[in-house]
Amino acid sequence: LSGGVWLRSGYATEPLRTGDSIVSVASSASVLYYSDEVTYEDNTSEKIEIVAMPCPVFSTGEKMVMQRGAGICTVKSTPDKEKACITFLKWLTETRKNVEFVTSLGYMPVKQEAFDACLPEAIKELSDPMYVSLYQAFLDTQENYTFYTAPQLDSYLDLETRFEELVRKVLSVKRQQCINKPENIDKLVKETLADFKVAYTQ
């Protein structure tokens, strides 16, 4: 409500490019869209350093992080095509090849042995500081965090979308009220929490 959260639609990488935001909690693959240069409204620009860190945790919270992303599957086909697909997947997930592939895209390796045996050495070969920082954060996350996955529900995507839309809508309204009467921020915080409790217990 005090203006510290980006509430507009679209990806959070956009406000980073214009200096409207300075921190983003995002997918690791967002590194593909980050820029080491900020361009301001007056068309001036400056170089910045982008640093990746493990997901933030409240002081009394558990170190947990959601694991999600694109998957690969096969469809029923001819024996030759199915064999070719399996051969490709084995090649892609072979430890060293997989590390080489993922470190160019911001993804995580798919095997534990990749973290243990290959990733530390691969980081030394990276030339882009953004990627070096990202994969150092990966090593920290892999060692110190517990991974969880989204519930396997047919309605999950719809629930997630509605959650995001409601949060943006409510916070945008309350943010405007805070701008109009900043002295009421404590009251608005309580009202906002109450609104969310009502919305998410229905």
Regions found by a protein language model. Name each.
Residues 139-202:
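Conserved C-terminal helix/tail region of periplasmic/extracytoplasmic solute-binding proteins
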